[in-house]
Amino acid sequence: MAPILIALVSLISYATTATKQTAPTKTESVAQSRDTSADLEAIGSVIAKYAKSIDSADTSLASQIWWDSPEVSFIHPLGHEHGFDQIKANVYTRLMGETFSERKLTPRDITIHVYGDAAWAEFYWEFNAKFRKDGKPIATHGRETQIYRKMQGNWRIIHVHYSGMPTTQPGQGL
C-alpha cells in the first residue's frame, strides 16, 4: 500500500501540472519540457495498449502496462479488484474473456497530467461488445481515471476507476 500512497501524495504535492493541453510555463526548462512531452507520449501509449489489452482480453499485454503487485486496484461497476492477480482473473479472464466474444474499447478526450514519477489520466470511452452466450451486442459509454507510477523508466498503471456516464434523471446517480 505504501507505494500507492507515495504516488498519490506525489500527485497532490507537486505544484505544477503538465497536461497534453498546456505548453511549458516560463519556469520550466527546455529539458523538463522534453521530459514531460516524452512522458505524455509514453502514457498515451500505455492507454492505447490498455485498450488493446481489453479488446483482446490479453493478460500478457496487460502485464506490460500494469504494475504486477498486490497493491494495484481496479474499481468498476461490478466490483473492486485488489492486486494484479485479481485484475487478471476477474477483469481480463472472467469479465472480458468469458463474458464477451468480441470487444472494442475506444478511449477519447484523453487528458494526462504528469507530476514527476506519478501521473494520472482521465478520458471518456465507448465499449462495444457481443455476449458470448447469445451473440447479442452491447454498447456502453463511460469515463475512466487511471493513475500511473514511473518505475525503472517505464510508466505502469497502479489504479483504474471507471464508471458509466452521469445520469440526469431525478433521484438517480446519487
Predicted regions and their residues:
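Bacterial N-terminal signal peptides
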Residues: 1-13
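A short acidic/glycine-rich loop-to-helix N-cap element
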Residues: 34, 133-139, 167-172
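A solvent-exposed, acidic/Ser-Thr-rich amphipathic alpha-helical stretch
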Residues: 41-42, 59-114, 124, 139
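Short beta-strand segments enriched in hydrophobic/aromatic residues
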Residues: 66, 125-127, 161-164
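A short hydrophobic beta-strand element
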Residues: 117-127
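Beta-strand elements of well-folded, non-transmembrane domains
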Residues: 127-133, 148
